[in-house]
């Protein structure tokens, strides 16, 4: 089943300076793979760099177990449901998607890419985004060490990575809008029609 992002995200440019220098995770927090991802990040990554790179967890229905874990650490904000999460996502240092479980394409990653943000994701989250290239459209990190190194480098010299957000937006505009899918389907139907004509001759 194809996934398309809302076209207005490509022009989204609202920012909030309160979130500068932080990283954000977004997703419904009653979905177990999202809980698994946040728990992994908090324990393995935030515990090491949270004093310099705070974490914002955006999403409805965070379970009590997660809130108890988060309460053990400084520099973590749990927002719950947010009417306009893109203002936060656009403002942060990077969006993280350290998915450890689950499968399928992550809309949150597509949307983060569509607004021109830098996304640091696990290989599991990146794999379904066909055509996306590590170091060009997003940054893949699978271990805690890779996350720590990547986010630290981003914090120290984000301008060096700014091109990734721009390339991500162009990539999503070309491949993950409903208009792009329509073009692919029309082309497929046309090719099938021509093939049928050739076989009939």
Q: Where do the model's predicted regions map?
A:
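Acidic donor-binding loop of glycosyltransferase active sites
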Residues: 90-104, 115-118
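Conserved catalytic-core segment of nucleotide-activated headgroup transferases in glycan assembly
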Residues: 5-91
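A short, well-ordered alpha-helix in the C-terminal region of glycosyltransferases
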Residues: 160-174, 181-184
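Short acidic/histidine- and often glycine-rich active-site loop of Leloir-type glycosyltransferases
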Residues: 123-140
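Short alpha-helical segment that forms part of, or immediately flanks, the ligand-binding pocket
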Residues: 86, 107-115, 128-130
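Short hydrophobic beta-strand element within catalytic cores of glycosyltransferases
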Residues: 95, 108-111, 118-125
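C-terminal alpha-helical cap of glycosyltransferases
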Residues: 178-201
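Conserved acidic donor-binding segment of nucleotide-sugar-dependent glycosyltransferases
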Residues: 138-145, 153-158
């Amino acid at each position: 089943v194809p996934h398309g992002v809302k076209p207005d995200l490509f022009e989204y440019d609202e920012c909030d300076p309160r979130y500068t220098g932080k990283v954000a995770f977004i997703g419904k927090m009653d979905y177990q793979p999202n809980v698994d991802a946040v728990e992994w990040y908090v324990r393995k990554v935030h515990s090491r760099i949270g004093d310099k790179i705070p974490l914002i967890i955006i999403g409805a229905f965070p379970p009590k177990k997660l809130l108890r874990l988060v309460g053990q650490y400084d520099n973590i904000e749990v927002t719950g449901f947010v009417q306009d999460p893109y203002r936060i996502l656009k403002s942060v240092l990077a969006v993280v998607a350290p998915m450890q479980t689950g499968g399928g394409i992550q809309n949150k990653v597509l949307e983060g890419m569509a607004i021109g943000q830098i996304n640091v994701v696990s290989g599991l989250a990146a794999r379904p985004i066909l055509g996306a290239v590590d170091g060009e459209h997003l940054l893949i990190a699978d271990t805690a060490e890779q996350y720590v190194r990547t986010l630290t480098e981003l914090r120290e010299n984000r301008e060096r990575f700014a091109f990734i957000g721009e390339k991500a937006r162009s990539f999503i505009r070309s491949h993950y809008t409903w208009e792009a899918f329509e073009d692919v389907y029309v082309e497929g139907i046309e090719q099938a029609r021509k093939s049928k004509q050739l076989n009939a001759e």
